[in-house]
């Protein structure tokens, strides 16, 4: 035990009441932090960091916490909130809590009770807590009536996270992140979302939720094996009136999504990705193309496109009813195409593509591509194509260079 204090020792109690920061690292035999009898005297703690305390079973936390980071505590199964008044009921509010990180807590099943509020929470990181099926505890009504149980949703519809800006959920057994009927302001300030190694995740954005993410700037999806579509645009609840889809998104990275077949299950009816700058698609083996020609017109600010190790990709931009457009990716600066065995060309539709800012092209192991485009491509700043990390080739334009590479595979 860390604080094994007799409640009659006034000087020790006075010091404990002044404690506002507690950092515990590498204490493998620590089983308890404080006596249960005096735990309420530990209620002014604002910063709590606990790492590698393998034997710690329960953890008391105060309501005035600002930062909580718990890592590699294998025996920890419960977090207990200290109330100023014993027997207090009703909602518990963490009015100052801004950052929460829960990592490698294999036995943690309860992080917070159902009646809890986080009006200031900005950053939440949860990684490898396999027993934690939901962020807050189930209500008694859900426990008594299984038909009301929304346990498939990691964030229940009763929880509001209206200040959350950064969310990491990694290596969690979660099927659905958020309930479509969660509070209307919840997640509306989210700027960065990272979902990694969530092997049961079925979807990310439903039609009722996607309208909330107007501030999202960075989206990373990695190793979510059951994820077949990122954006579900129909089939959940009626969509809200929306003028743009993800208008502030600047970086989209998707990798190792083995079942991903498309971005969305229905053609978007509103403009999307208007501020997207960087797009990275890696090891998505069921994708055959990225966008249709008309869809690609939305990506007017795209500067970097990296498409690698996608076994079934045949073209980057798919045919779109014979439409010819000359303004695809006008801001493009860097294009990387690597390990795409079935890629035939960038786009099969005719028309002159104008890429006045393109400066870097890297290609490697694209054996099926005979020419980059059917027609001309204007790239005034492009002077070479990287065919290895350092080796370059150039025959006057991109089409001729790609064609030469196809006819001379050992180049």
Residue locations for each model-derived region?
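Cross-kingdom leucine-rich repeat
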Residues: 1-411
